[in-house]
Amino acid sequence: LLNNYEKIDVIDDQIGIPTPTTLVTSTVEAIFFNENFMKMRGIYNIAPSGYTNWYEMARIIKLRLDLINTEKFSNKKINPVKSAYFASAARRPHYSRLSNEKLRKTFKINPLNWKVYFKKYIQEQIK
């Protein structure tokens, strides 16, 4: 969007955790190949630690873009707005974090902070 607009509005009141597919697949693999898999099967949440909102993610992306191409993105603006600013038929939760407690206790799997995965993803996209 920043390629096409001088200013974008991004929601800042919906809290969640961006979860990369690489985390999901590596966790499923670790669980599946666990020797006690059949005894411990069930429903588990998986998400990185920490939390954020859409505005914060957009801000981080812009900071990375500024490092790559200062002239192109330096004058672009990202404005935080509330969910009500955008008319939507779909209701969105304002707080949608998942708990990894069961996953931690059962399989001793402790995902890293979402920023670690997000930074890696952004770096891969820039290449």
Region locations from a protein language model:
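Generic structural signal for alpha-helix termini and adjacent loop/cap motifs
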Residues: N4, N34-E35, E124
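Mid/C-terminal beta-alpha module of Rossmann-like enzyme folds, strongest
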Residues: T27, N34-A89
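Residues that recognize and position ribonucleotide moieties
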Residues: I8, I17, G50, N79, ...
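NAD(P)-dependent short-chain dehydrogenase/reductase
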Residues: L1-G16, T21-A30
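Amphipathic terminal alpha-helices
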Residues: R104, L112-K127
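Non-catalytic, hydrophobic alpha-helical segments
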Residues: V24, I46, M57, L103, ...
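Residue-level signal for the nucleotide or nucleotide-sugar donor/cofactor binding architecture
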Residues: G16-T19, T52, L98, I109-L112
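A hydrophobic C-terminal alpha-helical subdomain
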Residues: A84-T106
